[in-house]
């Protein structure tokens, strides 16, 4: 249960940090129901969050991560989207954790992308053909790897994430 909470917190922090990268703030302190959060922007798309329970650092991606780093294949010809990609590393009382998220776009249609990933990863955990979305997830080597595809007006958005966190006792 704690591991799931850490994974969800990491994903939430990553989403929030992506939104804050361009804000230009250098250092801010926030009061939340859970306590004080210190936010520091260190430049170059790097933001650090510190609380009484640990810290997390987000860094916006500038290079395409490898399939090995992601733990999943990258759809051929898909274009890397730096703005939707980055990494989080941090520590808490439970130990160290890290998350890497890479976003890609392709002009290919949903069915073609879905078929390709199905051939590489097997049946998705979730698929909604009408909404044009599918998700795969696996736990491997101490990390959770997820692939999500979402049909867009033109083409498909692909999000691959790899998260490592301490195992719950």
Question: Which residues fall in each region the model found?
Answer:
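An acidic-aromatic pocket/loop used at catalytic or ligand-binding sites
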Residues: 23-169
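Low-complexity, intrinsically disordered/propeptide-like segments
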Residues: 10-12, 16-17, 33, 124
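Bacterial N-terminal signal peptides that target proteins for export
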Residues: 1-13
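C-terminal motif of bacterial Sec signal peptides marking the signal peptidase cleavage site
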Residues: 18-22
């Amino acid at each position: 249960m704690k591991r799931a909470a850490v994974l969800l917190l990491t994903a939430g922090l990553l989403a929030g940090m992506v939104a804050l990268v361009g804000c230009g703030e250098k250092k801010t302190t926030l009061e939340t129901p859970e306590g004080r959060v210190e936010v520091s922007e260190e430049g170059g798309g790097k933001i650090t969050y510190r609380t009484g329970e640990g810290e997390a650092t987000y860094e916006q991606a500038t290079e395409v991560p490898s399939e090995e780093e992601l733990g999943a294949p990258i759809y051929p010809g898909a274009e890397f989207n730096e703005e939707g990609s980055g990494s989080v590393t941090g520590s808490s009382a439970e130990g160290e954790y890290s998350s890497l998220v890479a976003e890609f776009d392709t002009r290919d249609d949903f069915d073609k992308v879905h078929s390709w990933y199905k051939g590489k990863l097997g049946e998705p955990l979730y698929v909604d053909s009408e909404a044009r979305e599918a998700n795969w997830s696996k736990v491997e080597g101490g990390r959770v790897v997820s692939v999500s595809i979402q049909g867009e007006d033109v083409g498909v958005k692909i999000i691959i994430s790899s998260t490592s966190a301490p195992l719950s006792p």
